[in-house]
């Protein structure tokens, strides 16, 4: 047993220090980035935000809506091959280039993903997703996927420490997914005692991945546009959002009605709700590590997307970053004990 004494930080523990700026308007900020990925060799340009691969967020409808903002969607793994065929036959190539195909690590997952990728050459992203990215089996699957799809850009996770981030990059991941337990409907930290504050995880993993030519996506922990800015400021190349994009018309959650008001269900992918829906219930040997919440309906996702992008542009103007790419270099974090004046929050 050992204890690490240095303090680890989440998004709520810091603010970004403002700096002198020559920017005259938020409209001067360029959010689009261009990446060339280490292993696939593919070049992609767009806004590096990703809708999470949850079945109440990462839907075909969400992908179609967010593509117009140049935002990616990691489409959840529970669509059938037939569902994918219907989608790829009608979606434009521009939409498909903003889509990640999500997969687990079983042999059946591998075969299914192979069939999906064969449907369109525009499907260039694969998201290999497990809750615990520290297993040898997972690393071996990433290597297998890289060998099978040498020209596809592979995103793999989740991990939170530098050494495992390096392992995944060396095994074939172009992008490492960072985050254990920070999600709004994730209960891993309270069920297991395992986790890592998200901002510190991002800073550590970005340093590790960038040293090898890899990239990271910060997955989880963002509750407001300012958190997205902090994730980019901490070194994330991409930011994945779940709860912030849930509850919309495109989110795919079940709608329930209580006292005349409509709500949409949103749940973690290790929750009892998710396991009951997809595998028939919680296995006897495990515990659910997610919760289910009811969100008031939030309308079309376009308004939320504009709010997030607007907040990000504003953050860049406060530190003098004319491009999102510059935000990390322009960021100085200050530790704080409060984020906002909450006097009217209960109204």
Swiss-Prot record:
Binding residues for NADP(+): 108-131, 216-239
Gene Ontology MF term list: GMP reductase activity; metal ion binding
Domain of life from the UniProt record: Bacteria
Binding residues for K(+): 181, 183
Enzyme class label: oxidoreductase
Catalytic activity reported: IMP + NH4(+) + NADP(+) = GMP + NADPH + 2 H(+)
Keywords: Metal-binding, NADP, Oxidoreductase, Potassium
The keyword Membrane appears for this protein: no
A single GO cellular-component term on record: cytosol
Any GO BP annotation: purine nucleotide metabolic process
E.C. code: 1.7.1.7
Pfam family for this entry, one: IMPDH
Alphabetical list of NCBIfam families matching this protein: GMP_reduct_1, PRK05096.1
Its job: Catalyzes the irreversible NADPH-dependent deamination of GMP to IMP. It functions in the conversion of nucleobase, nucleoside and nucleotide derivatives of G to A nucleotides, and in maintaining the intracellular balance of A and G nucleotides.
Annotated family: Belongs to the IMPDH/GMPR family. GuaC type 1 subfamily.
Quaternary structure and interacting proteins, as annotated: Homotetramer.
Protein name (database record): GMP reductase
């Amino acid at each position: 047993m050992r204890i690490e004494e240095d303090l680890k930080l989440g998004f709520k523990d810091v603010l970004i220090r403002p700096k002198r700026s020559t920017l005259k308007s938020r409209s001067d900020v360029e959010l689009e980035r261009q990446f060339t990925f280490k292993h696939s060799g593919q070049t992609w340009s767009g806004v590096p935000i990703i809708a999470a691969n949850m079945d109440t967020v990462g839907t075909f409808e969400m992908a179609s809506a967010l593509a117009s903002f140049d935002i990616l969607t990691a489409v959840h793994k529970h669509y059938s091959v037939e569902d994918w065929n219907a989608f790829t036959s009608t979606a434009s190539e521009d939409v498909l280039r903003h889509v990640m195909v999500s997969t687990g690590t079983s042999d059946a997952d591998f075969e299914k993903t192979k069939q999906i990728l064969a449907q369109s050459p525009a499907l260039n992203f694969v998201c290999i997703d497990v809750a615990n990215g520290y297993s040898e089996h997972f690393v071996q699957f990433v290597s297998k996927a890289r060998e099978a799809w040498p020209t596809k850009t592979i995103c793999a996770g989740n991990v939170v420490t530098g050494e495992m981030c390096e392992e995944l990059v060396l095994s074939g991941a172009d992008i490492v997914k960072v985050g254990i337990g920070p999600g709004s409907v994730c209960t891993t930290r309270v069920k297991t005692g395992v986790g890592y504050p998200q901002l510190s995880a991002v800073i550590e993993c970005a340093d590790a991945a960038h040293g090898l030519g890899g990239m990271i996506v910060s997955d989880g922990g963002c509750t407001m546009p300012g958190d997205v800015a902090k994730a980019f400021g901490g070194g994330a190349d991409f930011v994945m959002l779940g709860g912030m994009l849930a509850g919309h018309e495109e989110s795919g959650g079940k709608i329930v009605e209580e006292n005349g008001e409509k709500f949409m269900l949103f749940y973690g992918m290790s929750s009892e709700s998710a396991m009951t829906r997809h595998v028939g219930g919680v296995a006897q040997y495990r515990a659910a590590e997610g919760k289910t919440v009811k969100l008031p309906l939030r309308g079309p996702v376009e308004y939320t997307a504009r709010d997030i992008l607007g907040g990000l542009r504003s953050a860049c103007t406060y530190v003098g970053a004319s491009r999102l790419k510059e935000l990390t270099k322009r960021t100085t974090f200050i530790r704080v004990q409060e984020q906002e004046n909450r006097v009217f929050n209960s109204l």
